[in-house]
Design a protein with these regions (language model features):
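Residues that form generic nucleotide/phosphate-binding pockets
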Residues: 22, 70, 134, 141, ...
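Short, flexible segments with low predicted structural confidence
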Residues: 102-103, 147-148, 193-194
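Hydrophobic side chains in well-ordered alpha-helices
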Residues: 19, 66-67, 127, 131-134, ...
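Membrane-proximal low-complexity regions enriched in glycine and acidic/polar residues
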Residues: 113-178
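Membrane-associated alpha-helical segments
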Residues: 152-254, 259
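Phosphate-binding glycine-rich loops and adjacent basic patches that engage nucleotide phosphates
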Residues: 27-34, 89-101, 125-141, 163, ...
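Short Lys/Arg-enriched alpha/beta "domain-start" segment
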Residues: 1-111, 117
Length: 260
């Protein structure tokens, strides 16, 4: 037996509360930020998180397409970055402990809780990839100005565009901070050694914690660039203000001399 797991970043966020109220299936587990369904009649599984990721278990292409169209009704802003990850759960009753590999995990038995843990880790991986893309774009967009500063000793960016850039950086950072819980271990692993072991090994396999640390480091680089750009812009604005004051003083002197 094999379960194919597919995770897709569909939107920046979902309205989970509204979705749960209107989706005609009973949840296996969930909270205000996530919901997991074990659809036993069709041997399918579904996991939806409020930060825009959906994970399918044993869904064919038609069923996936229909659900994606449906879930978009609960999305704030859709994402078109082709962020997708596939993983497999294989059953082998002859083993006693889970065996985690790069693209599949082998388990001694299959139950909804095990599938949920696998789905959760894939969700975390895709969500991290989304934020990696966003921070990569921020670093790339700031690189142009850093090169310009190195070669010309000045920045051509306007105050308005800098403020837009600052807003974009803060928006990404706030989104990451709001969704820090994606790294939290689910409650059901606390009292279940088998699930805890599976969760820990999957986190290692997907490099969840190292990737988050790298993400935090890259955000720090962006923030340092912001500080530099702001300082340069403040100096430029200060110099411009000084020239305005000097010109006004000169005009005042000329007018005074003319009147006398």
């Amino acid at each position: 037996m094999e379960i194919i797991i597919e995770a897709i970043q569909i939107a920046e966020a979902f309205n989970i509360k509204k979705f749960r109220a209107e989706f005609d299936n009973e949840a296996f587990s969930g909270s205000t930020s996530e919901v997991f369904y074990a659809l036993n009649d069709s041997n399918r599984y579904l996991y939806v998180f409020d930060y825009g990721v959906v994970v399918f278990g044993n869904y064919d292409s038609i069923a996936k397409s229909k659900f994606i169209d449906y879930i978009k009704n609960y999305a704030t802003t859709t994402v078109d970055l082709n962020l997708f990850e596939e993983y497999r759960i294989k059953l082998d009753k002859s083993i006693s402990k889970v065996l985690v590999k790069d693209d599949y995990v082998t388990v001694p038995h299959i139950e909804a809780a095990i599938v949920g843990i696998v789905m959760l880790n894939i969700i975390q991986s895709v969500a991290l990839e989304y934020y990696e893309v966003l921070t990569g774009e921020l670093i790339s967009s700031s690189k142009h100005y850093i090169v310009e500063l190195e070669k010309k000793g000045k920045l051509s960016i306007s105050k308005t565009n800098l403020l837009k850039y600052i807003g974009k950086v803060l928006n990404v950072k706030n989104s990451i901070v709001d969704n820090l819980y994606i790294l939290d271990d689910p409650n059901l692993v606390w009292d279940n050694e088998e699930l805890n072991l599976l969760n820990r090994r999957l986190k290692l396999n997907f490099d969840i914690n190292p990737r988050f640390k790298d993400l935090d480091y890259r955000l720090q680089i962006v923030e340092n660039n912001l500080t530099l750009f702001t300082d340069v812009l403040n100096v430029r604005e200060s110099t411009r203000l000084e020239w305005v004051i000097i010109i006004l003083i000169v005009l005042e002197i000329i007018i005074a001399l003319f009147l006398h």
